[in-house]
Structure formats: structure tokens, C-alpha cells
Amino acid sequence: MDVSELEENLFAASDAKLHGDMCKELSAVYCKVLSIFPSLEEARPRSKSGIQTLCSLHIALEKAKNILQHCSECSKLYLAITGDAVLLKFEKAKSALIDSLRRVEDIVPSSIGSQILDIVGELEHTKFLLDPSEKEVGDRIIALLQQGKKFDNGSDSTELEIFHQAATRLSITSSRSALAERRALKKVIDRARVEEDKRKESIVAYLLHLMRKYSKLFRSEMMDENDSPCSTPCSPTGQGPNEDRVNAFGRQLSKFGSINYKPMNSRKSGQMPIPPEELRCPISLQLMYDPVIIASGQTYERVCIEKWFSDGHNSCPKTQQQLPHLSLTPNYCVKGLIASWCEQNGITVPTGPPESLDLNYWRLAMSDSESPNSKSVDSVGLCTPKDIRVVPLEESSTIESERQQKEKNNAPDEVDSEINVLEGYQDILAIVDKEEDLAKKCKVVENVRILLKDNEEARILMGANGFVEAFLQFLESAVHDNNAAAQETGAMALFNLAVNNNRNKELMLTSGVIPLLEKMISCSQSQGPATALYLNLSCLEKAKPVIGSSQAVSFFVNLLLQDTKTQCKLDALHALYNLSTYSPNIPTLLSSNIIKSLQVLASTGNHLWIEKSLAVLLNLASSREGKEEMITTQGMISTLATVLDTGDTVEQEQAVSCLVILCTGSESCIQMVLQEGVIPSLVSISVNGSPRGRDKSQKLLMLFREQRHRDQPSPNKEEAPRKTVSAPMAIPAPVSAPESEVKPLTKSISRRKTMTRPFSFLWKKSHSIHH
């Protein structure tokens, strides 16, 4: 086996999320067996038994590989609670390897057999043990799962504390790690459904519920508020005085996400408590008797969703998403929660499905028939998206009267009550669409922006239920009124709605967001949020030609050299990078004088700008026009040479990559680069740089040597290098070059005189090797 392949396998094993010690032991043996496997195949006898023996070894290796992959790809929480099962798998993999290796040892030459015996001996002495701390975490999570159905609001903090401690021990302490864990849990659920393992699915579904419930807490405690806007849904503009309000609203939302098992305090004594929305079927609006999960991940009463499908619908009634299949999976987790809630509130557990679907089924059916993708603001009231407050029909009049009384007694807090997630998305849309007071609309949109910041599911649901169009209408009115604060609020709400959601980005494009942004960038006060939204949209492939052919390109380029906010300038630079990855945009970018602007940024010496500027230049250099303009731009070669001297590893890698592209096929560019005295830097990078940097620097040095050999007269081919050994910096220069051409090189030597002595020993070593 190739050494690089072994290293790759070792790296994969060391990437284990949990049970790292066991993975390390098994991976070491796995790689040793892989290294001799080609020899085993060559030495195999042609008998049927010999082939079967090798096949058994191959199967044993595959088992070992699968358990290693399982530990590196699976959910940390699931690995923790299944520690004993994982340990058993390691023991089985070990036994299978020992048995198959012993059988192989009998049919191969003694030289290979001795290696096999050594591996078998190592395996026999290997003892797999669970890490005590990981086992403790697993036990705590199992205890939490067993008690999960008994928690009420009073002990919610206990559940939070236990889960938070367990997650922290598993290093789930940031927005990114929480997102990775949720995705891993979803994959486990998908596998459980394929395997039809209902118990496993129910357990993992509850773990996913806990992760979703507390992800906001982990993010608020641990995440860096300055994360890149393309990687996390945080706004690139600071929130300042609104920070306390944002945190308060986040705490409020986390309460809404919890299942409330206690009777609602707002109910009058003697009245029946209202079941939490999570326990009611969105179609029947009643407690579920036989809850099932459909392809969208939503839970419904079985008879209700079966009727929905039998009537010819192939979409989710709640989210309106088209479903890839119509299969149903029992949701035992929700069924257990329903039983627990009924027990604590003195209510009889449902003994059968609802007898009638009443009116709400037909409302949902009408909503589904009106639009398969999204709904207008006027028709939103016909659907029941995720966070709408739904109650049994017999209680609806009581709820309505309570709401009217609250509006009379607490008019100043009208908007705050409207944004309450339990009041529903339709109410929010109604305010954004019909409220005449811009200040109230602005407050609602701001609160929704905060909700969208950390809630991926809310982005999906809101995007599918008319919020893109509503926010664009709000932004259009803000632009028309020249209200900079409202423009920022609207743009950043759209920004958060578009994060990691290409469907919402496409809706914005087709709904006319670009003309609005072009108006915003004409006003200095709204350029920041407009640039941020441009950046988000530029991540979409379909948006790159649209933005690339608009006024945005020249605006971004001009912004690079203006004295504006750092974040705004960074957003513009990142947007230009995204646009430059679409090759038809390059002529437009070049015509906007982008290369000179990037050269100025890269020459500032500020590492904040250098790396991304060079990344854009690399994309531009991939075209013939871009390459030619870079070579002829005054100061460009000098700037790249300076980065080779003073840049960090990544910057040096990018700079040398640029120079390789520019010098390939261009003798004049090679002369310009050599006159900058780059040889010591290139030699240093070829020894100490990143793998790609080393490779590129060696290629560039090779280009220089080839050019020098082409320029040297053949009779002097052997003498020329010896004459120049005492002058390391002059070695790459063409020996036959006129004296006038050598002078700039001498000047370059003096400019970097301090660099000559430290790198001279490297150059001499390189000279002795290459010449």
C-alpha cells in the first residue's frame, strides 16, 4: 500500500468523535494489515480455500473500517449512549481479524507469515476499554432520556443543566458544533427509518429534540459574534444598544420551544388546560392518538394525514413542502410525551383517532390547492405553519375573547404580543403587510430577524409562507421613504432569511431584490446592509451572473479603496471573490479596475486584506485577460514578492501560486519576478511552507532554471553556474543578459540585503542539488 494512503487512513482514525483510544488501537492494526495485503494477494494459492481465506480477511478489514468510520461520522450523543454496543463491535472486529489472519498465516510464505504473527500477537494483547469520562457522560444522557418525559416547566432548568453539562463534556459548545451534531443525529434517524428500527428512531428523535431545544443557549454562551456572515446567520453589523433586547427575546423564544406540561396560568380556574402545540395534530387540532412522522419531519395523527394523502395531496400540510415519498413512521417519542402530559394534567389519554376533521382540514386543503410553493399575504390565514397557535375548536371562542380583552388592557404592547411565536406567522405577516405605522412594522421585522438568526427551520417555514415577498415589500417602502434604519432592518432580515437557504435566495432574485439593492448602495447610510445582503446572495450560483452584470461590481471595487467601515469593505471583498469564481464575470470585473484596487489592498501589509485579495487575484489570473493585466499593472509583481517575504504561510502559498500562473509562458514576467530578488523566499517556502506552497515554489524555481538554460549559450553551459556561486542572488539571472538588465537586480539585492545572509545557506544547498 502507498504510504500516503496509510497516512490518510491513520488520519481518518484519529478523527474519531468519541472512543478515540480504541479507534487509535484498531486503526494502527488496520493499517498494518493493509500494508501487507498486496503481498498476501500475490502469495495466495490458486485453491478455492485460499481465495476464501483472503475474502474472510477482507471482510474482517471491512468490519474494522466500518466501526472506525462509525466513530468518526456518527453523532457524539449517540456514540455516548451506545458505548457498550460500540465496545462490543470493537471486540468482534478484533476477533474477526485474529481468526482471519491465523487462517491466512497457514497459506502464505514464512516471510509474510512472521509479519502476520506479529500483528496477531499485537491484537491479542490489545484490550479495548471505554473511556471512564465518556461512559459517565453516556450514563447521564441515558438517565436524562429515561426521565425526559417526567420533566415539567418547574424542573426544566434541571434538564437544561444536565444536558448542558453532557454536551460540554462532548465539546458541543459552539454554534458550529451544535449544527454538526444536529445533522449527525438526523442521519442516524434516517438510518433507523431505513432499518425500520422504531426504538432507535424514537430515542434519537428525543436527542434531536434536546439539541434543538438548547442549541440557542450554547450559541449565546460560546459563539463568536464576529463569525463570517456566510457561515453563520449573524448580522455583519453590530447591534449595540439592542443587545439586551436581543438576548431577552432569545430567552423568550427558547421558552416557546419548550413543551409546557403544566396547566396554563392564563386559563381561568375550572377550565381545561390547553395541550402544547407539539402534542396536537395540525390537521385535527386535537391531542394525537397515533402520531406519525412524514417525510418533511412533521408529526400528524395517522388517520388525518392518511386522508390528506388519499385526497391526492403530496405536500406537507404545515410547511407546504413537496414530499419525496408518502411513507409514515410512528412517533413513539411524541406518544410518550402525550401520555406524560395527560397524566400530569389529569386528562384522559386519547383512546382513538378523532371522529371528525372539522373545518381545519378543509382550510389546509384550500391553502394547499392555492399555491404549491408560497402564499400571498392575503391567503396566509388559510394555513397553519409550524408556530401558529392551534387549539381545539371548542376552545377557540374562549381564546379569542381573551385575546381581545388583552388588546384592550395592554394596547402599548400590541406589537410585542404579535411577535410572540405562539400567535402565529400569519399575524406577523399581517402586521408587515397592513400596518401603517412604519415604527411598529420595523420592530416586528427586527424581532423576526433575531428569530431567523439561529433558527434554520424558521427560515424554511417562513420562506415557504410568504415572508420573502413581505420583507421585500417592507424594504421597498423603506427605500421609498429614504428611511436608513428601516432599510437596515429589512435588509438584515432578508440576510438572515437567506443564510444557508438557496430557495429563499432564488425567491429574492425573482421577486426583484437587485433593483432595491442598487437604490440602497446609492445612499452612504445604507451601503453596509446592502453589501451584506449582496454578499449572501453572491453565494448562490444563479445569482452570480445577475450581480456580475449589475452596478454592484463597480460599487464593490470602489468600496475597497474608500474610507468606510471595515466590515462593509470585507463584505465587498468577499462578494467580489464569489463573483470571480464565475468566469463570465471576469471581463466585467477587469473593466472596473479591480486589479489595481486589489494590488493596493494587498500592499498594505494588513493581513486582514492580503489573503482574500490574493484569492480574488488567483481567480482573475485564470483568464488570459486577467493574467496580462496583472503582469502589466505597476507594482503588482513587487507586491507579490513582498508577500513572499513577509506573509504568513497561507499568504505565501497564494502569492507563489499567482506567480506560477503569471510566469508560465511569459519570459518577460519571469524577468520581472527575478529582478525582485525572490529566490531566498522561494527556497525558504520550498522547505518550510505548506504542502501546496512547497509544490508551487518548486515549480516556480523550475521555471526560472528552464528560462536560464534557454538564455545561456550552449558552450558556456557548464561554466556559468560556477562563476556565480559566490553571488547567490544573481544565480537565477540570465548569464548572457546585458549589463543594463542586471542593474535592477543589484538594486533589488540591496533592498533585501538583510535577507541574503540568513537564506544563503539554503540557496547554496539548493544550488548544489539543482546544478
From Swiss-Prot:
One of its GO terms (molecular function) is ubiquitin-protein transferase activity. Gene3D superfamilies: Leucine-rich Repeat Variant, Zinc/RING finger domain, C3HC4 (zinc finger). Pfam families: Arm_2, U-box. The keyword Repeat applies. Residues 400-411, 706-722 have a biased composition (Basic and acidic residues). GO terms for biological process: protein ubiquitination. Residues 394-415, 706-751 are annotated as: Disordered. It comes from the Eukaryota. It catalyses: S-ubiquitinyl-[E2 ubiquitin-conjugating enzyme]-L-cysteine + [acceptor protein]-L-lysine = [E2 ubiquitin-conjugating enzyme]-L-cysteine + N(6)-ubiquitinyl-[acceptor protein]-L-lysine. This is U-box domain-containing protein 6. It is an enzyme of class 2 (transferase). Functions as an E3 ubiquitin ligase. Keywords: Repeat, Transferase, Ubl conjugation pathway. Residues 274-348 form the U-box domain. ARM repeats lie at residues 456-499, 502-542, 544-581, 583-622, 625-664. The keyword Repeat applies. Pathway: Protein modification; protein ubiquitination. GO terms for cellular component: chloroplast. The lineage of its organism: Eukaryota, Viridiplantae, Streptophyta, Embryophyta, Tracheophyta. Its EC number is 2.3.2.27.
